[in-house]
Amino acid sequence: MRAESQGLVFGPVRSGRLGASLGLDLLGAKICTFDCLYCEAGATRALTAARRPYVPAARLLGELAAWLFEPHPPFEVVTLGGMGEPTLNTDMGQIIEGVRELCPGTPVAVLTNSSLMADPDVRRDLCLADMVLPSMDSLMPSEFLQVNRPLPGASLMDIRRGLLTFRRQFAGKLFLEVLLLAGMNDSSENLARLEAFTAELAPDRVDVTTMSRPGAYPQALPASPATLARFREALCGEARPLAAGPEKSAQFAPPLDNEGSRRLEALGMRVLDSLARRPQTASSLASALGAGEADLANLLDDLSARGLVKAVTLGGETFFSRVGR
Ligand code: SF4
C-alpha cells in the first residue's frame, strides 16, 4: 500500500485542522507571493504575483487518477496547497472540478495566504471549493512586512477588502488562520485589529497557531503558550482543538519491508523528497512513509553523515530537513 507519492500528490497527512488530508501541489516548486519568515517549505525562490498554469490541470489530475488507481490509505479531504501559493495557478478552478469527479463526495479545501483575494478570478475559482483556509497574520502594516515579506507593493488594505468580499460570495466553510511569531506579530495592536476584523469577517472558525517546525529564517521563533492563549481567547470564542502541534500522518500503511538494499535506497529517495517539502521529525516521517522508526533513524543518520539532511531542534523536538531545499 502506498502512503506517499513523490510527485504532486502527497500524503495523506493527519492535519489538526482538516483530518486525514490528501495534498495536491499546484506549484511544483517554491513559488509564492510571500516569503514568510516561518515558511516550512524554505525561502521563496520565485517571489511573484504572476498567475500561470504552473502545474497544468491535466498533469495534476492525471497524477491524482494514477494515485487513486493504486491501493492507497483512506483520506477525508483533498487539500490544494503545495510549496507556494496555490491561487497563483490559473488552472485552480479546473483542478477543483476535476478532483470532484475523481473523488466524489470528498470535500475539497484550499489553503491560501489571502494575497490574491482582491482578484475576482481568484475569488470565483475559490468559490468552487468546500472549504477555504485563508491566513491573516497581522493587520499592522509593519508586522505584515516583517513576517510575511510580501512582494513590493502588496496592499494589506486590498487583502482585507478581498477577504470581506469573498466571505459574502462564498457559500462554503471559511477557516481563518492567524500564525503568531514571538516578538513579531504578537502585539496588542494587532490583536485589537484582528478582533475587529474577525467580527466583521465572521469566519466559521479562527485557528491561532504558531510554528511547529523550523521555518525558513532563523529569526522566526514560536509564540509562547501565554500569547497563544491570549489571542485564542479573543479570536476563537469557545474552546476548540488547537492545530499547533506537529501534523501526524495517517497511520494506515503497514511497515515496508526494508530488508533489501534497493528498497532502502528507494526509501531514502522518498525521505529526501518528503524532506524537501518541509522539515519533519523521524516519527512523523516514518508514519507518512509507512516505514519502521528504527529503519528511518538509521537512514536519517546515514543521510546526515552524507550531508544530505540536517537536524534542527525546535520546542524540544528534532526535525530533519533537506540540505539546500
Ligand atoms: S508560508 Fe505560505 S504564504 Fe508564506 S512563503 Fe510559505 S507558502 Fe508562501
What are these regions (language model features)?
Residues 88-227:
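Conserved AdoMet/S-adenosylmethionine-binding subsite of the radical SAM
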Residues 79-85, 113:
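Glycine-rich beta-strand-to-loop/alpha-helix junction loops that act as flexible
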Residues 29, 46, 85-86, 183-184:
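Short strand->helix junction
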Residues 18-58:
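Canonical Radical SAM [4Fe-4S] cluster-binding loop centered on the CxxxCxxC motif
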